[in-house]
Amino acid sequence: MLLPVIMAGGTGSRLWPMSRELYPKQFLRLFGQNSMLQETITRLSGLEVHEPMVICNEEHRFLVAEQLRQLNKLSSNIILEPVGRNTAPAIALAALQATRHGDDPLMLVLAADHIINNQPVFHDAIRVAEQYADEGHLVTFGIVPNAPETGYGYIQRGVAVTDSAHTPYQVARFVEKPDRERAGAYLASGEYYWNSGMFMFRAKKYLSELAKFRPDILEACQAAVNAADNGSDFISIPHDIFCECPDESVDYAVMEKTADAVVVGLDADWSDVGSWSALWEVSPKDGQGNVLSGDAWVHNSENCYINSDEKLVAAIGVENLVIVSTKDAVLVMNRERSQDVKKAVEFLKQNQRTEYKRHREIYRPWGRCDVVVQTPRFNVNRITVKPGGAFSMQMHHHRAEHWVILAGTGQVTVNGKQFLLSENQSTFIPIGAEHCLENPGCIPLEVLEIQSGSYLGEDDIIRIKDQYGRC
């Protein structure tokens, strides 16, 4: 059986304003009801696989857990990176964790933010790769190119491993992102693939090759795994150890150096959705080439991508535009300038704006909070607590809170006194009071929260007890 290893790090800044640091693109529902992470996992349906192992930023742990829970795939195989160190260390953490008890699984390493529309062809490529990975090869999947793309690295294939029609090829070399002329030559030659960043190999084989070529990375990752907190829900990698690990991609660290690399071609309508333009390319369009998502309307417009979170967006007489409207930001740009979105994100960071980092709607392990009004002296939040969810038992030094129940039933604790509130009832939480809100019901609990005080920062949450381990 295969062990899917899903790399779910990254911030996806080129898909701002929908993708933010605390809610990056792999968790977005850009196509249908599933997020890109969820699609990556459900795409494996029909193959013999273990429960997936997911590697993510520790700030995204509850997002990952909730999205896995929605698929009934939640397990304790969520590895939390305290800091990003690129793909070679991330895969090493997964391989070390997978071999802790003597096992040596076939690891299928996938990115959480790819689109692969032809699932049968993808499965066929996996079955081919499985045979050769089982024999000790390190398999990379090369995307059959259909354009002289300058945004991807390339893999040049060498000699065929066998004479069968579905043979993999030895890897001749990895090539950095080319200019347009060289990309055209690569496409015409028929000898090059796009580098997908997807792999398959035995866990111990990867570790042995890493030991040959980058023992410093292996040593740092081994120390981090040895000191990890293997809690009931997550595998927490210690910051003080892992931050010393070198930052290196698996291509540079292992795949370019090993003698055992082979490439399996994949022609399955793949995209890494690295920009709004790429998303327009792979999305269903109307007769004028427009992609409309959410509350959007167009007239005499062509080849536009319009995505509106909640406001109506009407576009008249425009073409080749990307218009993305969220609750707190609007992006308007020429579709050919998709790579410049990062400049907007850099501007927001430099000016200490919060829009690069988080949405107005913030996700918590107990549910979500929509910031309706935010001022220096008071905030108004619409809170949704999922069934069984609960705030931590906490207190604040500088703010009081008013809770009004909009729907459902809440169990409130204030300074040891416990009581129930139902729709249209309210309560007051004084400054310094120990308090907690729980949802004992089977439907979501909706609450209007008004915070008021001299300081409203998140660091004025003093947690006393928490069922999610945040104390």
Curated annotation (Swiss-Prot):
GO BP annotations listed: GDP-mannose biosynthetic process; O antigen biosynthetic process
Similarity comment text for this entry: Belongs to the mannose-6-phosphate isomerase type 2 family.
Matches recorded under CDD domains: cupin_PMI_typeII_C, GDP-M1P_Guanylyltransferase
Enzyme class: transferase
Descriptive protein name: Mannose-1-phosphate guanylyltransferase
InterPro entries the UniProt entry points to: GMPP_N (IPR049577), Man1P_GuaTrfase/Man6P_Isoase (IPR006375), Man6P_isomerase-2_C (IPR001538), ManC/GMP-like_b-helix (IPR054566), Mannose-6P_isomerase_type2 (IPR051161), NTP_transferase_dom (IPR005835), Nucleotide-diphossugar_trans (IPR029044), RmlC-like_jellyroll (IPR014710)
Keywords from the UniProt entry: GTP-binding, Lipopolysaccharide biosynthesis, Nucleotide-binding, Nucleotidyltransferase, Transferase
Misc note: There are two duplicated genes for manB and manC in this E.coli strain.
The UniProt record lists the keyword Cytoplasm: no
Entry EC number(s): 2.7.7.13
